């Protein structure tokens, strides 16, 4: 029998649940030259949170992401992307908060726009190990919600 090519993944690319998440790269905060690239996380459940220091609900939910990362960090990829052009306030905020998780910057707003976001924050996107969006929400989340979404994906 002749070898045949595997069919191409024809999943539509976009930001709706069920679509293949658009690839993006964002510079990691505090790591000179470090980058978070979605395609480099292939095979891992990836949790992406968009936030800003001026957004009260964003700041309130960041500890949940830090707890999720502490619990599942070896098994998942997680990044909290600051959606703002100004980084001075990020420096001050992260210096006083004790949040042990990766942070990145979206200085131009291109990353959040590519995932369908606007000026509304917070926004959370969860991508499964195959790169498909399984959760996309503008608004606050809780640790219980995050664990309830991530744990079943890791069990697959």
What are these model-predicted stretches?
Residues 47-49, 69, 80, 125-126:
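Hydrophobic beta-strand core positions in alpha/beta domains
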Residues 59-97, 107-114:
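Structural microenvironment flanking redox-active thiols in thiol-disulfide oxidoreductases
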Residues 92-100, 105-154:
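Thiol/disulfide oxidoreductase modules built on the thioredoxin-like
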């Amino acid at each position: 029998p002749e070898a045949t090519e595997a069919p191409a993944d024809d999943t539509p690319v976009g930001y709706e649940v069920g679509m293949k998440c658009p690839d993006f790269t964002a510079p990691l905060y505090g790591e000179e030259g470090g980058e978070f690239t979605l395609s480099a996380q292939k095979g891992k459940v990836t949790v992406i949170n968009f936030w800003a220091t001026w957004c009260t609900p964003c700041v309130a939910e960041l500890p949940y992401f830090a707890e999720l990362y502490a619990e599942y960090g070896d098994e998942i990829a997680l990044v909290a992307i600051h959606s703002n052009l100004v980084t001075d306030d990020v420096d001050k905020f992260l210096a006083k908060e004790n949040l042990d998780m990766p942070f990145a910057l979206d200085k131009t707003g291109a990353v959040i726009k590519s995932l369908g976001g606007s000026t509304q924050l917070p926004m959370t996107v969860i991508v499964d190990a195959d790169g498909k969006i399984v959760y996309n929400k503008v608004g606050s989340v809780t640790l219980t919600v995050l664990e309830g979404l991530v744990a079943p994906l890791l069990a697959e």
